[in-house]
UniProtKB/Swiss-Prot annotation:
Protein biosynthesis recorded as keyword: no
HAMAP family reported for this sequence: Ribosomal_uS4_B (MF_01306_B)
Record's subunit section: Part of the 30S ribosomal subunit. Contacts protein S5. The interaction surface between S4 and S5 is involved in control of translational fidelity.
Pfam families for the chain: Ribosomal_S4, S4
Molecular function GO terms recorded: rRNA binding; structural constituent of ribosome
InterPro entries in the record: Ribosomal_uS4, Ribosomal_uS4_bac-type, Ribosomal_uS4_CS, Ribosomal_uS4_N, S4_RNA-bd, S4_RNA-bd_sf
Span of the signal peptide: none
Protein name in the entry: Small ribosomal subunit protein uS4
This protein's GO CC annotations: small ribosomal subunit
Length: 208
């Protein structure tokens, strides 16, 4: 599937839930989904009979859009999760959570996953002391993500840290704000992911 270049708020309305694609704005009364919580288009308010397949597809699309992953890569993640020990759905979410761009967002060094992805590509962060510029890199327990001294005055990073102070950091991560440093304390567990996701629908979709 190609990149989706339409307005982010339309994505939220299409999926029927907030995807938090605009970072802190999604927590304010400026959120477009709060004003129009129905699908975009002329028939957005119409009630339709939805098939099981459509429900499964929408759930998959929702998760893809939350993490900013294209179809081919998402399918690859599912295959990897299916081959690993444990529950496939939980494995899939753990893989997505361990992406470097997501971890940077969770640590509060970016206001959204998209912003985190852009910052990573520009080489703003280091991983275990080395420059990391691949957003899809998988972090491991003990990894240290840091903003080098030269990049600490970037306005978007300072603004994002103010947001994370209000929003909080997941228990599997540890952030030292004054030092602009984050540590992966453990692997993410299913209960660490608070966003409403029914991963079983995705497993059913790909198992057909």
């Amino acid at each position: 599937m190609a990149k989706y270049n339409d307005a982010k708020c339309r994505m939220c309305r299409r999926e029927g839930t907030k995807l938090f694609l605009k970072g802190d704005r999604c927590y304010t009364d400026k959120c477009a989904y709060d004003r129009r919580p129905y699908a975009p288009g002329q028939h957005g308010r119409a009630r339709k009979k939805v098939s099981d397949y459509a429900v499964q597809l929408r759930e998959k699309q929702k998760v893809r859009r939350v993490y900013g992953v294209l179809e081919r890569q998402f399918r690859g993640y599912f295959h990897k999760a299916d081959m690993a020990k444990g529950v496939t759905g939980a494995n899939l979410l753990a893989i997505l959570e361990r992406r470097l761009d997501n971890v940077i967002y969770r640590l509060g060094f970016a206001n959204s996953r998209q912003q985190a992805r852009q910052l990573v590509r520009h080489g703003i962060f280091t991983l275990n002391g080395r420059k990391a510029n691949i957003p899809s890199m998988q972090v491991r327990v003990g990894d240290i993500i840091e903003v080098p001294e030269a990049s600490r005055k970037i306005p978007v990073i300072a603004e994002a840290q103010e947001v994370i102070a209000r929003r909080g950091c997941p228990s599997w991560l540890e952030v030292d704000g004054p030092s602009f440093k984050g540590t992966v304390k453990a692997l993410p567990q299913r209960e660490d992911i608070q966003f409403p996701i029914n991963e079983h629908l995705i497993v059913e979709l790909y198992s057909k």
